[in-house]
Amino acid sequence: MALPVQAAPQRAQVRRTAQFHPSVWGDYFIKNAPDNKMVSIWKEQAKVLEEEVRRMIISETQKPSGKLKLIDVIQRLGIAYHFEEEIGEVIEQVYSNYDDDEDLYDIALRFRLLRQQGYNVSSDVFDKFKDCKGDFKKHLVNDVQGLLSLHEASYMSVQGEKILDEALEFTKTHLMATQLSSPLPDQVSHALRWPVRRGLPRKEAWQYFSIYQQDREHIEPLLKLAKLDFNIVQKLHHKDMSIITRWWIDLDFTTKLSFARDRVIECSFWALGVFYEPQFVFARQVLSKAVAILSVMDDIYDVHGTIEELELFTEVVERWDISMKDQLPDYMKWYFEALIDFYAEIEAETTKGGRSFCIHYAKEAVKKQVRAYITEARWFNNDYVPTLEEYISNAVISSTYPILITLSFCGMGKFASKDVFDWLFTEPNKLLYTASGLARLIDDIRSHEFEQERGHVASAVECYMKQHSVSKQEAYNELNSIVVNMWKDLNEELLKETGVLPKPILACILNIVRVMDVVYKDEDSYTNSRNSLKDILATFLVNPVPV
């Protein structure tokens, strides 16, 4: 049912306040320039090791199962981007020459790697591991490596794959109950908390270094290459952060819009997580600035703006007319000027690259964004709590996921053609809808309590509680169940679009959801960035890996 905005009673016009804590990082990345003396030496060493690893991948003497294990390690160590062509060829060969005479570890690994690569292989391959009663065979509980491999594979499931649902429960139960000798306890506990499918590649690489190093069969040149590469890329990212910090300081939002979260480095975590590879330097720059700009917009709508100011601001953005800025209050004027300048920067860079079409889609995305935000502002102003379905239909936009994807594509050069943008804006778009809804629910489950304390539109939690007259815990249970199913839908849609969209585009879509899963795993670590996210960023940007 449509919301009767005008008929509903309205709140008194009082500005809310959130009292966000100040920046953790300040101008750290400007004042602490990295020592790049070792980078040239690291690059020379890495170049030699890279060729050695390449020879391992294409070796004719290694069995397919051995190559798959090697590829899995390469991907987990975060260096697969150096060997995409070779990995693709091996995966295609393995897909074309299936060998059923393998153990649980190998079959589950093969299944996962093929699905990760976009091959829609059948989960029936796991039927052989069930007994006549339809249960997984009891002897499998003693095969810890096999259980781990099956556990990881189960997260590649799509709707209707009952055997993978059963595999997940079976492996969880027995992995949690099993006492293991080193290094498997670390690997097991990490897999239970961060399965490969949901882990952020750059973060997972750092955490896998110690696990792989404890493996008695680890390949030393491979491990050394991964560590060198991590440190080389870290120096590049440090430089990115100094540029972004300078841009942020020049905007002076901490003074002009002091009510907003000062989180520019935390905003850059999205970019570092999605585009850690060196080649995507412009994409990182665009996405870092986009998250920072949109975070302030979110606080304008959710924290500071009155409904009258927000209605006017929405109209100004929808018209995209800089001459209207003088109608806005000063804080909105400053913000709108920064938004216009950011878009002008994108337009200039994409036009130079022969992609002037990008800016049209970017503008359409921000207009959709303010329409979604003003809808929520009206709901809050009128004390209206929508049904979950009505909420989600708007929240997939207000989540910022669609605009972040759009702006990310602007920075991706040749991979994001006009056809890709046309696909993105085609409705219905189940892949975009699923990823956006998933991002929104992950956020809501962890952040809604703090938001409600300061005054905020009803989240998915409050909407579900009111609609179904249930407790908060019951709402959590149901929404977490929806999240599980949306991950399955996301897996299915990514499989469908493989071959239609370039792999970097699909990786971008997946990685933004993964970032949300990291940021909101236990709490809203973006808003409260003094804890886990600070440590992750220090790992990404400050602390080199001992080689």
From Swiss-Prot:
Positions annotated to bind Mg(2+) 1: D298, D302
Gene encoding the protein: TPS3
Domain notes: The Asp-Asp-Xaa-Xaa-Asp/Glu (DDXXD/E) motif is important for the catalytic activity, presumably through binding to Mg(2+).
Described function: Probable sesquiterpene synthase.
Assigned protein family: Belongs to the terpene synthase family.
Gene source species: Ricinus communis (Castor bean)
Keywords: Lyase, Magnesium, Metal-binding
Protein name, as recorded: Probable terpene synthase 3
Biological classification of the source: Eukaryota, Viridiplantae, Streptophyta, Embryophyta, Tracheophyta
Note: Does not produce any detectable product when tested in vitro.
Pfam families: Terpene_synth (PF01397), Terpene_synth_C (PF03936)
